């Protein structure tokens, strides 16, 4: 099984999702990896810890099947960042001993990176109604537009923590953002 993706799009996605991947002392070892979920229409990359999770999606240039795997962020991201913009093919391979790895193929070479079993990753099930948590999904451009609209009113001095930053209010049908400098809201 293999898929092809634009190296620049994948690099940007990995950098954005990777901000939540713990680099050391992960309470669950699988969380120190990216979770890749590939279909013919989309490539989903998830990263996070036990309290927060981020998932990004890009479209593959081509894909010949579905696959799920865990992969360490450092070797993958460091290698992809060093490549010029080009198609990057990632093929799942299995050794005779049963070990799996991703074979990254590009115009000037290749790299093999071991991968783990995606079933070890903490499930991304919708939170139950009894635990009080909610799941929200939104377009990143909508979130950026909301933050950009309220950020001019944010109080710049960190000595008054209650006025510093942007406040998020999650309601059942929308997300409200608020900021104040004690003059404008």
Language model regions located:
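Structural preference for solvent-exposed beta-strand-turn elements
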Residues: 1-185
């Amino acid at each position: 099984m293999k898929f092809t993706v634009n190296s620049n799009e994948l690099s940007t996605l990995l950098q954005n999702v990777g901000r939540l991947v713990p680099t050391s002392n992960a309470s669950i070892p699988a969380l120190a990896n990216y979770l890749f979920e590939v279909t013919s229409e989309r490539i989903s990359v998830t990263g996070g810890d036990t309290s927060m999770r981020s998932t990004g999606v890009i479209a593959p240039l081509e894909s010949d099947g579905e696959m799920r795997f865990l992969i360490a962020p450092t070797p993958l991201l460091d290698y992809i960042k060093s490549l010029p913009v080009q198609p990057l093919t990632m093929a799942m391979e299995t050794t005779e001993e049963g070990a799996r790895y991703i074979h990254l193929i590009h115009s000037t070479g290749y790299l093999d990176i071991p991968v783990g079993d995606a079933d070890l990753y903490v499930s991304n099930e919708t939170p139950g109604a009894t635990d009080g948590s909610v799941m929200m999904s939104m377009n990143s451009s909508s979130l950026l537009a909301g933050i950009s609209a309220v950020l001019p009113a944010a109080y710049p001095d960190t000595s008054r923590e209650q006025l510093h930053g942007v406040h998020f209010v999650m309601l059942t049908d929308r997300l409200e953002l608020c900021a104040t400098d004690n003059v404008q809201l």
